[in-house]
Amino acid sequence: MRADLDAFLEHLRSERQVSAHTLDGYQRDLLKILALAEKAGLTDWNALDTRTLRTFVARLHQQGQSSRSLARLLSATRGFYQYLLREGRCRHDPANGLSAPKSPRKLPRTLDADRALQLLDGAVEDDFIARRDQALLELFYSSGLRLSELVGLDLEWLDLKEGLVRVRGKGNKVRELPVGKAARQALEAWLPLRAQATPEDGAVFIGRGGKRLTPRAVQLRVRQAGVRELGQHLHPHMLRHSFASHLLESSGDLRAVQELLGHADIATTQIYTHLDFQHLASVYDRAHPRAKRKGNADGGNDP
């Protein structure tokens, strides 16, 4: 059974050319399914039935696994079984028709515009680390990059003269994004210092030794900046969420925000409309004459 799993992972890597992050996710989820099958005494994938898989998913949910994680596990299982069916290694898909337990969708955490400016407008020392960190923070917020997109960014994809950056997002899709003035200036201040560090390759963001920054290193730098400037923990995706929320709030153009974020489905982008409504409701509560009378004991029972 492990041989079939390894063959599928190699198929994903070499033929479908999925990212290392995606491949790790598939492997992690499918190893859980393999452990389930072995614990049940199964000797081939055809013996795993829908009832056993449903019970396993329910148990994981009771143990605290999120609906999102379980949906990903079922998706990986379906992909694996579709591969087995094509290869003639199996006659059915036990995950077909199964869905993860639903849970309320959490709204993404964002910074309000004033807090974003507070994070980015502080004094920046003219040294390697400070200039690099300022550039990556500005680019996250200016262009709404994912962490993987920023870490994977190479110089050849950056056009500061035109104020554009190209990134390779999910599904290997390339999109072109604008780079705002503040981010351009931060990058222009950073790149000469980068060149002095003898970079190993074309990575835009590197450490002192010239190596490309890892996702973990960027997460730590963003977190430290949040604590230092705002007194709160901050993660890269919060800057991406803030970019999307502030842009939608100002423009109202959901399709444009979808394109900039690289979402394949506009339903994914629509979560930011809920954030925008929260902002509008807050403004209403503060500014509308009738709203301000709520809870006012002197309001009486006006006709």
Curated annotation (Swiss-Prot):
Cited Pfam families: Phage_int_SAM_1, Phage_integrase
Gene Ontology cellular component terms for the protein in this record: cytoplasm
GO molecular function: DNA binding; tyrosine-based site-specific recombinase activity
Gene Ontology annotations of biological process type: cell division; chromosome segregation; DNA transposition
Segments forming domain Core-binding (CB): 1-85
Keywords tagged on the record: Cell cycle, Cell division, Chromosome partition, Cytoplasm, DNA integration, DNA recombination, DNA-binding
Organism domain of life: Bacteria
Cellular compartment(s): Cytoplasm
Family: Belongs to the 'phage' integrase family. XerC subfamily.
Protein name, UniProt field: Tyrosine recombinase XerC
Record organism: Pseudomonas paraeruginosa (strain DSM 24068 / PA7) (Pseudomonas aeruginosa (strain PA7))
